[in-house]
Amino acid sequence: MASIRLLPSCIVLMFLARSSLCYFITIDAHGEECFHDKVTSGTKMGLIFEVAEGGFLDIDVKIIGPDQKVIYSGERETSGKYTFAAHMDGTYNYCFSNKMSTMTPKVLKFSMDIGEAPKDTSKEDNAGHDKLSEMVSQLSEAMTGVKHEQEYMEVRERIHRSINDNTNSRVVWWSFFESLVLVAMTLGQVYYLKRFFEVRRVV
């Protein structure tokens, strides 16, 4: 009966065990956008990002801890995943920089997954409940990972579709340009031959 009574709370825990939201942002040329989350020491954090539109689809990324220590830094990255455990209590900042771009804004999709804060297991008086909560938390983490994979597959599909559309558009315009050149050359040759025979007739 205890397991049955715990089931509703476990279902709620499965959806609340991890804090995770996805965002689309636009970063102007020479611009930088920073975000922050306040967590306790030992909390697992995972940054996932992908450039959806703009230029060469690259961005500079940096994660900075509360002590101003650089935890992760990457330059001209198209996409990435970085997971780490908070080494101390405080506010963690993660910044996306488009300062390398001279005129092209970038559209970026990102999410920061924040796990549960570590618990003091010495104060737990119900080993079965603790084990069940841990299993539900792991399941929630796996479901969140699958969700993000699906979302970023959609972003990649959007990028590839945009590239294909641009390529097809360029092919169509190039074919149209070639047709105009061919028509112009044909008309030029006809005009030249007509003038040539008119001159010979006069002579």
From Swiss-Prot:
Residues 1-22 form the signal peptide. It is a single-pass type I membrane protein. Its main location: membrane. GO terms for cellular component: COPII-coated ER to Golgi transport vesicle; cytoplasmic vesicle membrane; endoplasmic reticulum; endoplasmic reticulum-Golgi intermediate compartment; Golgi apparatus. The chain crosses the membrane at residues 171-191. One of its GO terms (biological process) is intracellular protein transport. Residues 32-114 form the GOLD domain. The keyword Signal applies. Residues 23-170 are lumenal. The keyword Protein transport applies. Residues 192-203 are cytoplasmic. SUPFAM superfamilies: Supernatant protein factor (SPF), C-terminal domain. InterPro entries: Emp24-like (IPR015720), GOLD_dom (IPR009038), GOLD_dom_sf (IPR036598). Keywords: Cytoplasmic vesicle, Membrane, Protein transport, Signal, Transmembrane, Transmembrane helix, Transport. It comes from the Eukaryota. It is found in: Cytoplasmic vesicle membrane. Belongs to the EMP24/GP25L family. Could have a role in the budding of coatomer-coated and other species of coated vesicles. This is Transmembrane emp24 domain-containing protein.
